[in-house]
């Protein structure tokens, strides 16, 4: 076996060396803590091998928050480098690595698992379902994502990170990027992408087949509707990217020439493949975010969502148009006027259904009895900030004007105004909103609001000046500039904004830690002062029972739960319990994830034999699973009755305590 040992150690500045020294101690420390508290068996049996959608969702969310920290550190490094002219904080290639990993981590390893985590926690509960359609696949999906995440983050200290940008354009990502860096990009995203595709298929079938029988599609909660439409985008878009990654992997490792002009390949083929996936990917993360806003705004406005059916059709329209706009990412790359005109118009058209959504949210707020809890603050801040991102998007959609905006900081500001306000605000709002459903207690609202104000103000301080920098000609991906360029002051202000955002995130961390220690535990399930409007609020808090619902709930309207509460039927209990069938835990996903991680690592360093051995291990695991006779197990009706009796008693005590305090 010829393994390139000389490529393992990354020789760089003090930050890389510090990370290389710290990483082994962090791993050893984590192992020591788990061993000291004797948690290995508990973690393996209750979490790593779990097929409970709620626990898998929490594991996704923990991973996403960790990646938010990693991506945020990258962002602070970028802003520190650009704070003053001719800064020596980062050298050119290290800067390229950092902005590449920042983009990949924030979109693929932060935003997507955040969305998938909330899908797992909320969607089956909103649908009145026991679990997802394919629980074992759900476990496998998570571990494939986790394997890709581990591999990509390993690149910083072992072998070197990719430095060709998050778009990884050929030929820069080919012959001009020697070493394992781009291989990390290709293999890690490929493994994670397979898991994402499996998740899309799983939730597509779950929403079709597992929702409560009386729930019709046009009456589903908006988060479930946007999830269903998003799964269609995942199923259609991810295979394209899977093929593109496989072709570039073949180019780099096996010497094919799909993206090399000299031998009949076509570099622009990669750009088309990437953006046929890449622009729908934006809507893969933003449509579920729209669904979250459509749950949070009616809750704290105490009103029905205005225009529910028009919201569904607008979501479908956005999803359809998302596949017809990819060329707007390279208007300047030599297309003819006819092609640019078509994609310019199709891009502008997306503003129509998006505008419908914005007006529906505003009309939901109109004459509502609004309370300003932190999820609502994020939702309200989203509307004007996202509008600015959308308007600048229409400016960029004009092909002739794009020749001036393209690859400047105007574009950087635009996509951060859409993705941060559209997705990150929603993820933070959704995490706070559904946190009591997962953990049984609310996060501290004072700290949450400090998080909001620092994060929202910091965001605008950071990115609003970048519109001006772009109009003044500052190119994106520029690692330094001269004093004579005149960009110092705005870059300095932008960096201050990034620091404010980091402080805001620290307030959220403080809220999580403080609330874990101090917050009162809640049992009612309808945690936001009884304002919940969908079925997940009818179940117990703190990871609801494995079976979710003791009886199958009825659902006749998208505000059925509000009507149920008005008539005193909000806890879905007729005492007519039956045995409930549930799936068994499985080790398949965990071990496939280990094989994927090890095999992917060897393939990154082009060591084929060990990679093939790990591939064989994956197939053996799948074959072993196929021969297992696993019919699941049943929770006896008597156990269901005991559980429900305990929950009723806890709810009574909680209501009495609230009445006594008032």
UniProtKB/Swiss-Prot annotation:
One of its GO terms (molecular function) is oxidoreductase activity, acting on diphenols and related substances as donors, oxygen as acceptor. InterPro entries: Cyt_c_oxase-like_su1_dom, Cyt_c_oxase-like_su1_sf, Cyt_C_Oxase_1, Cyt_c_Oxase_su1_BS, QoxB. It is a multi-pass membrane protein. Its main location: membrane. Gene3D superfamilies: Cytochrome c oxidase-like, subunit I domain. It catalyses: 2 a quinol + O2 = 2 a quinone + 2 H2O. GO terms for biological process: electron transport coupled proton transport; oxidative phosphorylation; respiratory electron transport chain. Its EC number is 1.10.3.-. Pfam families: COX1 (PF00115). Its cofactor is Cu cation; ferriheme a. GO terms for cellular component: plasma membrane. It is found in: Cell membrane. The chain crosses the membrane at residues 14-34, 56-76, 103-123, 140-160, 187-207, 228-248, 273-293, 311-331, 336-356, 376-396, 415-435, 451-471, 492-512, 587-604, 608-627. It is an enzyme of class 1 (oxidoreductase). Keywords: Cell membrane, Copper, Electron transport, Heme, Hydrogen ion transport, Ion transport, Iron, Membrane, Metal-binding, Oxidoreductase, Respiratory chain, Transmembrane, Transmembrane helix, Transport. Belongs to the heme-copper respiratory oxidase family. NCBIfam families: QoxB. This is Probable quinol oxidase subunit 1. It comes from Staphylococcus epidermidis (strain ATCC 35984 / DSM 28319 / BCRC 17069 / CCUG 31568 / BM 3577 / RP62A). The gene is qoxB.
